[in-house]
Amino acid sequence: MTTIASGHGIATVAAGKTLDVWFPAPQLGALAATVPSELTALVGSDEARGVTRELVKVEIDITAAPTDAQDAYLRLHLLSHRLVKPHGLSLEGIFGLLNNVVWTNFGPCAVEGFESTRARLKAAYGHVTVLSVDKFPRMVDYVIPSGVRIADADRVRLGAHLA
């Protein structure tokens, strides 16, 4: 069994803190040399949310404890993509590596200064819906596993392994 996993992703960053990372195609094994072109198109800033979207390349040892938020998000994606079974990788200390995030209909936002962010979002787009304030996002905003039905997406977090 391989203990290496990897992925190219897009990290949402605010004031140097990683709010989330989306890995559309995580894999077991070494990092692929080619970055998917659809990811490079997502790099940039979102002034209304006060964030930047950055391309990240992550390769981890799944038997070691996660080292940062990017590593943690890759592990959550591996579970939800069903590439690794529950207890098949180390999640030791993961809670402390993730930031609290305001999850909105426009994407993740920093908790600090959110009322100013809300005002910018309202000015740009109108109504803003806050879905939750939590460390773990809804799974379906990142992964749609095949062969399952999810009646209430708000109750299933990234990192869930649905059979």
Where in the sequence are the language-model features?
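Terminal amphipathic alpha-helical/low-complexity segments used for targeting or macromolecular assembly
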Residues: 1-140
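Structural signal for interior beta-strand "rungs" in well-ordered beta-sheet cores
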Residues: 143-163
